[in-house]
C-alpha cells in the first residue's frame, strides 16, 4: 500500500515540475489507516494516520500547502500552513515566511525550508472565534511545526532542523572581531572604519575592562526564524538591555545593520519585533525612533518617531512623525501633540526587553 502511495505521489510531483502548475491533490482518505507521505521534487512530509480524511494539499515544484478540508469545502479558504524550499533567502525573506532549517540534496544543493501561515481567518468565523477554531483546523494549524519536522529530501539528502538559524552557529567571525578589538584596544577611528560602535573603546577606557562591560545576545528580532546579533552594554536599571550594534544575516552571511553610542542607543521592545532608537539632540531635545530590521537585508524599515523638542516649541514640545524620508534619511512632517495624547501613544509600545548579554570575557582566551 505504502509503495503505491509513494508511486502516485512521485508521479504527481513530476507532473507539477514539468507543467509548472499547481496540482490539487486530496490526501489522507478516511479509509486509509496508514500515514500519508506527500512529496514534491525536493522534499516530502509525512502526515499521521489520525489526520486522514481531514485535509487537502496543493503541491508545486517547491512547496506543499495544507488546507482543512471542511473549511475549504464550506467556502472559507481552509488554508492552514505551507512548507516550501528556496535556494536563495532573497526568494522568500520579507514575506510571511519563517525559516525552519536547511535541506541539502544529494548533489549538494542547499535549500532553506520555510513555513508560512494565513494572514486572515481561513475557517467559518461566523460560528467560531479566532481562538476557538474548528477541531480539525486547529489540529492542522497548531500541529504544523510537528508535521514540518518530518521533512525529508526525496533524493536521499539531509534535512537539518534549525540549521542556519541560531546565532551561535552564524556569527562566530563577528564575535572574534570584537574580541580582537577589545584585546588590541582599537580606538574610535579604527572602530568606525570597521563599522563597529565606538562604545567598545569607551567602555574600556582607563581602568575599565570592556570585556566585562560589553556583551552579545542572539535573538530573532523580525520573526523570520533567523537570529540577529546584538552588541550591548552589561548594566542594570533603566539601561539594562541597551545595545549599540546590530548584525543580521544577508544571503546566509553576517552583515552589519547599524551602530550607535551612548547618546544614540537601541533597545528591543518586549512585545513585537520593533527596535527603539533612543537619542538625544541636546539638553532640550530627545526622542525615540522605532524601526524593524528588514529580513535578509542590512536595511531598516522605519515605523514611527517621537520627540520632545523645546527648541521648536518650549510650551508644548511633544511631536510625532509617521513619515520617513529615505532620500534625506530624516523624519519629516512632525505633528505637535498635547502631553497626555503623546504619552498615551508612547505607552502603546509597552516596556523594553531587558536583555541579558553574554560578556565578551567568557569567550576571550587567556594568552
Regions found by a protein language model. Name each.
Residues 222-233, 271-278:
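Acidic/hydrophobic-patterned starts of short beta strands in beta-sheet-rich repeat architectures
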Amino acid at each position: 500500500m505504502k509503495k503505491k502511495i509513494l508511486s502516485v505521489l512521485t508521479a504527481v510531483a513530476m507532473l507539477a515540475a514539468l507543467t509548472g502548475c499547481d496540482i490539487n491533490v486530496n490526501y489522507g482518505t478516511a479509509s486509509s489507516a496508514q500515514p500519508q507521505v506527500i512529496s514534491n521534487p525536493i522534499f516530502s512530509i509525512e502526515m499521521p494516520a489520525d489526520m486522514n480524511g481531514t485535509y487537502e494539499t496543493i503541491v508545486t515544484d517547491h512547496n506543499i500547502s495544507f488546507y482543512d478540508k471542511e473549511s475549504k469545502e464550506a467556502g472559507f479558504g481552509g488554508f492552514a500552513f505551507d512548507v516550501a524550499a528556496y535556494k536563495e533567502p532573497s526568494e522568500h525573506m520579507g514575506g510571511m515566511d519563517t525559516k525552519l532549517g536547511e535541506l541539502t540534496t544529494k548533489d549538494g544543493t542547499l535549500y532553506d525550508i520555510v513555513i508560512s501561515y494565513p494572514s486572515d481567518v481561513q475557517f467559518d468565523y461566523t460560528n467560531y472565534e479566532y481562538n476557538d477554531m474548528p477541531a480539525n483546523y486547529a489540529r492542522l494549524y497548531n500541529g504544523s511545526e510537528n508535521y514540518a519536522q518530518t521533512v525529508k529530501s526525496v533524493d536521499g539528502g539531509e534535512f537539518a532542523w534549525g540549521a542556519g538559524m541560531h546565532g551561535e552557529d552564524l556569527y562566530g567571525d563577528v564575535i572574534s572581531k570584537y574580541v580582537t578589538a577589545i584585546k588590541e584596544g582599537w580606538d574610535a577611528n579604527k572602530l568606525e572604519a570597521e563599522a563597529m560602535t565606538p562604545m567598545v573603546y569607551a567602555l574600556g577606557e582607563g581602568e575599565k575592562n570592556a570585556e566585562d562591560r560589553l556583551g552579545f545576545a542572539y535573538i530573532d528580532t523580525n520573526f523570520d526564524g533567523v537570529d540577529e546579533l546584538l552588541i550591548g552594554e552589561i548594566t542594570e536599571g533603566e539601561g539594562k538591555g541597551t545595545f549599540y550594534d546590530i548584525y543580521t544575516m544577508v544571503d546566509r552571511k553576517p552583515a552589519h545593520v547599524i551602530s550607535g553610542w551612548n547618546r544614540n542607543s537601541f533597545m528591543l521592545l518586549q512585545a513585537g519585533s520593533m527596535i527603539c532608537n533612543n537619542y538625544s539632540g541636546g539638553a532640550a531635545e530627545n526622542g525615540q525612533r522605532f524601526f524593524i530590521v528588514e529580513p535578509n537585508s542590512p536595511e531598516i524599515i522605519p515605523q514611527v518617531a517621537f520627540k520632545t523638542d523645546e527648541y521648536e516649541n518650549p510650551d508644548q514640545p511633544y511631536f510625532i512623525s509617521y513619515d520617513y524620508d529615505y532620500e534625506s534619511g530624516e523624519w519629516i512632517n512632525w505633528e505637535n501633540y498635547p502631553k497626555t495624547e503623546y504619552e498615551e501613544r508612547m505607552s502603546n509600545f509597552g516596556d523594553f526587553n531587558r536583555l541579558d548579554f553574554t560578556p565578551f570575557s567568557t569567550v576571550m582566551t587567556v594568552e
